[in-house]
Structures are given as C-alpha cells and as structure tokens.
Amino acid sequence: MKGGTIQISWHDGKPVLTVDFHPISGLLATAGADYDIKLWLINSGQAEKKVPSVSYQSSLTYHGCAVNTIRFSPSGELLASGADGGELFIWKLHPSETNQSWKVHKSLSFHRKDVLDLQWSPDDAYLISGSVDNSCIIWDVNKGSVHQILDAHCHYVQGVAWDPLAKYVASLSSDRTCRIYANKPQTKSKGVEKMNYVCQHVIMKADQQRGDETKTIKTHLFHDETLPSFFRRLSWSPDGSFLLIPAGSFKVSPTSEAVNATYVFSRKDLSRPALQLPGASKPVVVVRFCPVAFKLRGSSSEEGFFKLPYRLVFAIATLNSVYIYDTECVAPIAVLAGLHYAAITDITWSPNASYLALSSQDGYCTLVEFEDKELGEAVSISVGKKPVDGEEKKHDLEKGDELMTETTPDESKKQAELEQNEESKQPLPSKITTDGKEKEHIMQKTDDEVMTETRHEEENQPLQSKVNTPVSNKPARKRITPMAIDP
C-alpha cells in the first residue's frame, strides 16, 4: 500500500467537501466550496513504486453555491450533486466518439436549505437526500419530482443511506437519532404498488446499569449538534448485511467519560447495535464499505465477529484519521493518521478496490493505492438474495438491549494521548508506505524521501502548492479492538 496527500490545486485552495468514484470508468469526482465538480483520472504509481497521481479531465459547472455531496448512480449513467441553498441537480452522461461529457439532466427543487448528503436507490430510479431543513426527501428521478418526504428529525439531517436490497433507508441527524425506514408499499386503485417508507426504528439511547443497583438509566448513543462537522455519512455493506453508523458516543458507565465509536447494525436486528468499534480520539464522521468482497484468508489467529462466506472491507474516517477494517479480523488492518491539517469530509473506494480517496477541508485530497490482491482475492456477491444466516455476530444478541464494552476510560485516554502526540509531530505527511511483513500498515517517511519527492513534484506539477512538510520518523501506529455488546 502506498499513498499520500496530492498537493495540487484541487478546488482553488478551497475546502474539498465530497468525493466519489465512477462505478464503471473509475474516474474520481470531487466537489467543494468553489461551486464546481471536477473529474480526475487516477494514474497508478505501482510500476515506479511511487504515490499515485491524478490528471485533470473536466469540470461540471452549474452550481451557484458550495457543493456538499456528489454520488454516481449504480449504473454510472447519472450523477447527483447537492449544494447549499437546497440546490440538487441530476447530471447525465453523454458519451461521444471523442470524449464523454456530463450535462444537467434535471433540477430537483424542494429543500429550503443546504443539502448535506444523498444516496441512490439500487435501480437508479430514486434518490434520497438529507438537508439542513431537518428533512429527508425521496425523489422520483425519472419524473423529477418529490416521491415522499420524511420529516421526523428535529435537527439537521447529515447522513442518508439506501439499502442495496431496497427494503430500508436510513438517516442520521444531529438531533442524536438514527431513523430506519422500511418499505411498506401502498396498493393503488389499479393494483400497482407504490413505494412507501415507514419509520420502523428510532435509535437514540441505550440502557446502562447504575453501579450495583438494579435500576438502569438511558444514555445517548450519538454526539449532539456540537460535533464540529456538517457530515455524518453512514453506509450499508454491498450485500445489505450490515449498516455502519458514525458519530457514536458511548459511555462504559453513567459516570465515565464518553468514548467515540462507530456502531455496526445487523440486518437481522436494526433496532440496536450488534457491535461497536471504539477508541478513536476524534469523532467519526464518515464510514464507507468497499464495493468488492474478498475471499476468506482463513489464516488469522484472531477470531472474527462475523460468520460470512467472504470478507468485507470498510473504512472509518474520524476528523483526523482513517481506520480500515475487514469482517474477518478484530483489529484494524490499516491506520492512517496525520494526513491533513483540517477535518476529513468524505471517503470513497474505487470500483475495483485499488484506491481509497479522502477529501478534507484543508483543500487537499489523499489517495491510497493497494497492490494487486493486497486486500485479498475478489469474489462475487449475489446482491438481491437473502443475507446469509451466519451474518450475525457469533455471540447471542437476542436477549437484551443493554450496550456494554470492555474498553476502560483509562485505556481510551491513553489511546487518545498517543494519537494526539503522534499527530502533533507529523502535521502533514505526504506519503504512506507499508512493510509487507507487518500486519498493521505504518505511515513513515524519511527526510531524504521528502526532499526527493518535493523536487520531483515541483518539476512535474506546476499547479502544486509548495509546502514544506514536517516529518516524524516515529511510525503512527494504533490498535483498536472492536467490542461486542454484552447482552
């Protein structure tokens, strides 16, 4: 694995707020506070053992405000973009013999305030958006009209996700709730069923034991509106088995210090978390599953939490770091920290799992390239079939709603202090390397490498901002152990 922060003028030095890969061509789309959407071609650096680079392709200019979210449709024929002021456009691909161009296909107007997140339905026919006006809207893309309004939240809706099996949609808000909606079609007079999503679960609090007493108190599962991010982007697994929800804030006991966490929900029971991934020093703002499933390694000495016939890989981004997990291993398989000066805003995987991209408010993007079969051997997923019976955590989760963890406050403080100390010594490393003999990926860069890479970039990238990168020879390494919920 190699990667680094590509120090070019992505969006005229303004914050990059969102990124997404085209599901077919692999083009990278970025958007931000300069009102434009830009398309980039990724150039592999494996042959020369260098950090991957990008080549500018084109700009999509139509928005009059900062663009907060962009998402390609599953077919790759459409692109949706949401911006400040409620702007929401659908772009359509117009291929030609010489090039490919994107033109505005529809303008979806109803949101009164900023659109913060959106997600396509599996069939490209519908779109769900979340907004600062406290509502989610399901759009009929073909008609260009509102299909359904979900307005139960009482604060900003900062993340939305559409189940790949088309049964559920989920929304996450700064009102400290996550709402799960189930599709319960309504039958029209002509016998045609109309899609209709009804709130099935409101995830807000969990029971906690009060010392040795038999009484319990309820504690919030999510951060409140003081979380310093406009985004809480959640994600379904590509097979629909799991839902990852960021912005978790969990207390081991009612009097303990809150621990930042990501919650894993099983499709079999979406009313409460099946698993939590604690330990990050900063709040989690974005989660994203890799679209590719991988063959089981079968050689791990650690017992995993899920019985799946394949491995799923996912990335968790906090305000200042990224953790990469798979479903076969308890510990993260990679930790990336100290990459940006400002908060991370979005992450995305390439369709072939070769690249992971992330954007930041500091105006830069980071690209990570994985070597061939570094993540494993790809296998197919039969989306549309019922999730496997063994998708659940190995422990029995059916007996109670109590949320427990073995992580102590002292351990969490030590982890937070370690990460903060490492980041203060390494503000903006521009290269990520790994040692193939180690299980964890280690970010490290020598002074000679910095000088060589800086000279090379100055000669070959005229738009690049000339930034002297402080470097630490101390690896930024961190272990986080996910904890199952003890019923």
Swiss-Prot record:
Q: Which superkingdom?
A: Eukaryota
Query: Which biological process terms from the Gene Ontology are attached to this UniProt entry?
Result: DNA recombination; DNA replication-dependent chromatin assembly; double-strand break repair via homologous recombination; heterochromatin formation; leaf development; meristem structural organization; nucleosome assembly; pollen development
Alphabetized, the UniProt keywords read: Chromatin regulator, DNA damage, DNA recombination, DNA repair, Nucleus, Repeat, Transcription, Transcription regulation, WD repeat
Chain intervals with Polar residues compositional bias: 461-472
Annotated SUPFAM superfamilies:
WD40 repeat-like (SSF50978)
What is the annotated localization of this protein?
Nucleus
What stretches of residues are WD repeats?
Answer: 11-52, 62-101, 110-149, 152-191, 222-275, 295-335, 339-380
**One Pfam family in the UniProt entry:** Beta-prop_CAF1B_HIR1
Query: Among the entry's GO cellular component annotations, what is one?
Result: CAF-1 complex
Q: What is its main location?
A: nucleus
Annotated spans, Disordered: 387-487
Q: What happens when the gene is disrupted?
A: Fasciated plants with broad, flat stems and disrupted phyllotaxy. Shoot apical meristem enlargement and altered floral development. Reduced heterochromatin content, more open conformation of euchromatin and dramatic increase of homologous recombination.
Per UniProt, the ranges with Basic and acidic residues bias are 387-402, 410-425, 434-459
Whether Transcription counts among this entry's keywords is: yes
Give the protein's function.
Component of the chromatin assembly factor complex (CAF-1) involved in chromatin assembly following DNA replication and DNA repair. Required for several aspects of development, including seedling growth and leaf hair differentiation. Plays a critical role in the organization of shoot apical meristem (SAM) and root apical meristem (RAM) during postembryonic development by facilitating stable maintenance of gene expression states. Seems not required to maintain transcriptional repression of heterochromatic genes. Involved in heterologous recombination.
* Subunit and partners: Component of the chromatin assembly factor 1 (CAF-1) complex, composed of FAS1, FAS2 and MSI1.
Write the protein's name.
Chromatin assembly factor 1 subunit FAS2
Q: What is the organism field in this record?
A: Arabidopsis thaliana
